[in-house]
Amino acid sequence: MTTIDLNSDLGESYGSWVMGNDVAVLDLVSSANIACGFHAGDATVLFKTVRAAHARHVRIGAHIGYNDIAGFGRRNLDIAHDDLVAETIYQIGAIQAAAKASGAVVEYVKPHGALYNTIAVDEAQAAAVIEGIKLVNPELSLMALAGSQIVEQARAVGLQVEQETFADRAYTADGQLVSRKLPGAVLHDPETAARQALAFATGQPITAITGESVLVDANSICVHGDNPQALALVEKIVTTLAAHEVQVSHAR
């Protein structure tokens, strides 16, 4: 049977403000990218989400971002190398402490939002994130955009990389994500997202936003937890994959 990792960005609530339906999503995914307090989340949300993931045997990842909670980490920041190294270490350390207190372990790091997109093309910021991860634990893997430059940059210094695709995002003809600033960048229809996820999982091409067929190689598929249809998307993806004998399972 074919297997594929299904992940979601979770733990992004803050105080009395609630984002998504994390517990229900955790019942369906195999990996949880949990916010570490910089782009979203807080100490209580972080700890509760880690415990909930561990209780469901869901793999735990550090979802690190720019220190920009007001912008939800989706604004580009020009940040010095040493500062980004330190902020990477700081965020991983926070979730590692929560994991240790829960009897769990952090297995990978997935950057968020603008940081994720920047390090896919910017070798300097990518180097800072890679350095921070390696200083904390070189056994942590990096989850990154499939086919982006950071994949080889991280592998060149010994980091394991998990190449990621997105069930709920549109792609360009060259296999890149369509900018969120453009209409149609985010997919909200469960049927469409499930069809795209199945293609990723089975090594088939997807249809770009401009109509071309695009083949994107990956071993993990993401559904954004802040997508209003997140739960419906995940439910449809899981049932569609199962109907085609694809099992949702950890990437490692």
UniProtKB/Swiss-Prot annotation:
InterPro entries: Glyco_hydro/deAcase_b/a-brl (IPR011330), LamB/YcsF/PxpA-like (IPR005501). It comes from the Bacteria. One of its GO terms (biological process) is carbohydrate metabolic process. Coiled coil: none annotated. It catalyses: 5-oxo-L-proline + ATP + 2 H2O = L-glutamate + ADP + phosphate + H(+). Its EC number is 3.5.2.9. GO terms for molecular function: 5-oxoprolinase (ATP-hydrolyzing) activity; ATP binding. The keyword Nucleotide-binding applies. It holds the Pfam family LamB_YcsF. Keywords: ATP-binding, Hydrolase, Nucleotide-binding. Forms a complex composed of PxpA, PxpB and PxpC. Catalyzes the cleavage of 5-oxoproline to form L-glutamate coupled to the hydrolysis of ATP to ADP and inorganic phosphate. Belongs to the LamB/PxpA family. This is 5-oxoprolinase subunit A. It comes from Corynebacterium glutamicum (strain ATCC 13032 / DSM 20300 / JCM 1318 / BCRC 11384 / CCUG 27702 / LMG 3730 / NBRC 12168 / NCIMB 10025 / NRRL B-2784 / 534). The lineage of its organism: Bacteria, Bacillati, Actinomycetota, Actinomycetes, Mycobacteriales. The gene is pxpA.
